[in-house]
Amino acid sequence: MDEFHRCGKEDSFWQQCFLYPLFFQEDLYAISHDHYLDVSSSSRPMEHLSSNDQLSFLTVKRLIGQIRQQNHSIVLFVNCDPNPLADRKKSFYSESVLEALTLVLEVPFSIWSKSSVEGMNECKSFRSIHSIFPFLEDKFPHSNSILDARIPYSIHPEILVRTFRRWIRDAPSLHPLRSVLYDYRNSPENLQRSIIVVPRVNTRFFLFLLNYYVCECESILFSRLKRSSHSRSLSHGSFPQRTHFHRKIKHIIIFSRRNSLKSIWSLKDPKIHYVRYGERPIIAIKGADLLVKKCRYYLLIFRQFYFHLWSEPYRVCSHQLSKNCSSSPGYFLRVRMNPLLVRTKTLDELFIPVLITNEMDPIVPIVPIIGLLATEKFCDISGRPISKLSWTSLTDDDILDRFDQIWRNLFHYYSGSFDRDGLYRIKYILLLSCAKTLACKHKSTIRVVRKELGPELFKKSFSKEREFDSLPFSSKAAARSQRERIWHSDIPQINPLANSWQKIQDLKIENLFDQ
């Protein structure tokens, strides 16, 4: 496999036309066999399989032939198996074939995605998640509207297979993929549905499908815009799911899909900025309201024509940047534009022009966060702290660690805000909720708990906060922290509160469009 991957561009034609013979390589199934045993909950699937470390290659060959003739009783996924003890051996070999299928498809996909990235000489930037906040401060003040264009979460299996045919010419290699997708679609839990692409089950196969699906959406979208553009300065590209990036697009002219000679709408030097985290892209636009509506309409039409699916209107929503909250990444950050007067003068002091510009002034959305904490039973709707009853069965250390993690993530994210009063109010709510939870567990009072624990409450968070405020940026670090924004980029994972807040906002948007 390494040699096959190392060939790269030299044997790209051979890689596209002769993938199917790889399914009958014994080394491939040895790799998938070892990987399956590593991720399996048990060290050995069955006793009769433990006598031999290698797979039965004849059994694998028979299974490949049976996949296309299987009925719904043969389940390819362990977590969907209604009777895992009876069909464990069959499920084990099915998982091995699924792992092998993923390995075969990952090789040409990685080569294709890498070549597409290397071919973009005009790509303006390529950044990680830690550049989200500098991106907001650098780009958002020059925009007045944003589009929250969520990637569609489902697609028909046949449409997904046809997208693979665009860059894989070996049709027989896609037959196992088609069979796996249809088998998963026809499972009892997904009956009469399209295959769910979002990796709700954390398997390598579904992560690969998500990476490919997102890459395909973005590559087709940007390549379509480039072909329709009169300028060659258009930046476009496609990257895997683990990569976070943003683009700057200039001089876009979009034409009709059916008649390329007829222009739908034309843009003269627009400013469009694109950033994506997970499945939630954000497009910042500087222009009139008509421009924003046309961009939103184009995204809906693009998904309908290229992926043959009806995208709900609420999945592409637009709003003014200065009046609403924006999500990035997983949290909601409210932005306020403040005009600044910048005076400049020449050396000869001939004139002193006055420039009016905007700056991003992020503030803590205290009301939405309190509403989210009330939904998660940390406080009531008015912000009064209450005990978290569902955590009373945990140990004291686990309770302290959970509250500490919530506060640490919130503090690190909103540490760049000028307004700290709302942030400290959130700390007060979490502090008393933690004390009430411990008091409810030990059937005591808050005063007794605070007297016994003392500085143990949020000990890690307080130490982090002191360390953050005393960073040696200058001799006047304490004074500067009150005037300037310092983003503390230490977000190892998205807080569960952010995911819950995201779901609440999605439901509100869906209900708004239903009305």
Curated annotation (Swiss-Prot):
It is found in: Plastid, Chloroplast. It comes from the Eukaryota. GO terms for molecular function: RNA binding. GO terms for cellular component: chloroplast. The keyword Transport does not apply. Keywords: Chloroplast, mRNA processing, Plastid, RNA-binding, tRNA processing. GO terms for biological process: mRNA processing; RNA splicing; tRNA processing. InterPro entries: Domain_X, Maturase_MatK, Maturase_MatK_N. It holds the Pfam family Intron_maturas2. Usually encoded in the trnK tRNA gene intron. Probably assists in splicing its own and other chloroplast group II introns. Belongs to the intron maturase 2 family. MatK subfamily. This is Maturase K. It comes from Pinus thunbergii (Japanese black pine). The lineage of its organism: Eukaryota, Viridiplantae, Streptophyta, Embryophyta, Tracheophyta.
